[in-house]
Amino acid sequence: MVGEKLVAYMLVSVLGLALLRSVFGQHMPEEPCSVQILVPGLKGEAGEKGEKGAPGRPGRVGPTGEQGPPGDKGQKGSPGRYGKMGPTGPKGLKGDMGDPGPKGPNGEPGVPCECAPLRKMIGEMDIQVVQLTNELKFIKNAVAGIKETDSKVYLLVKEEKRYREAEVFCQGRGGHLAMPKDAAANRAIAGYVTDAGLSRVYIGINDLEREGHFVYVERSPMTTFSRWREGEPNNAYDDEDCVEMVSSGEWIDVACQLTMYFVCEFDKDTV
């Protein structure tokens, strides 16, 4: 490529001289002249590597790359601040009635009084009590169908209540839920239930204070007598702490929140 350029340059120079000679040949003296032809030299050897140049300007932003795979799951962060208190929830159901409280201390002695009028009044009241007692016996036997043994009076209450409510009802009338402590009492209560056409009633036995340790409702321990149905007590669902009697006289442990009829027991000498 360089050689071709050199030949072309020489031809142009010769043609230029020939043209000058033809134009100005008559007037030019024939004196010798020198012609200098400048010919580019050959390519030199490569020089030494120069110093590192300054950084160029930032290039254009390249196209967006493909989405990379998800990174590893980060560590669990620290708990945030407590949020605002939520709205007040609905009012809950009324709970069961609690056990009766302990007996309070005796009151202060009364002031002295004239007792003669009171004795007369008490005598008159005793007469009325005798009359009322006779009337009550009639009601027991003829209307209410109350059952009696040598020492106990049993009252069947045909009003469905939970266990604790039933015991409070009996206590409010001077008694407790029926506590069959021997075979005779158990037969009397079972016969009462059968005669009334019922299938089951609450009786005064539970293990509310210690699971599996059944006691009578007035907290006296059970001794030798029991009438559990086969497979009972089984504490099904871990929620059977009270006892029912079925018409056959057998006992079954049941949940205390069930509602059913019940039998109250009273000492005969207090009725």
UniProtKB/Swiss-Prot annotation:
The keyword Cell membrane does not apply. Pfam families: Collagen, Lectin_C. The lineage of its organism: Eukaryota, Metazoa, Chordata, Craniata, Vertebrata. Residues 149-265 form the C-type lectin domain. GO terms for cellular component: collagen trimer; extracellular space. SUPFAM superfamilies: C-type lectin-like. It comes from Danio rerio (Zebrafish). This is Collectin-11. Keywords: Calcium, Coiled coil, Collagen, Developmental protein, Disulfide bond, Immunity, Innate immunity, Lectin, Mannose-binding, Metal-binding, Secreted, Signal. Residues 1-25 form the signal peptide. A carbohydrate binds at residues 200, 240, 244, 252-254.
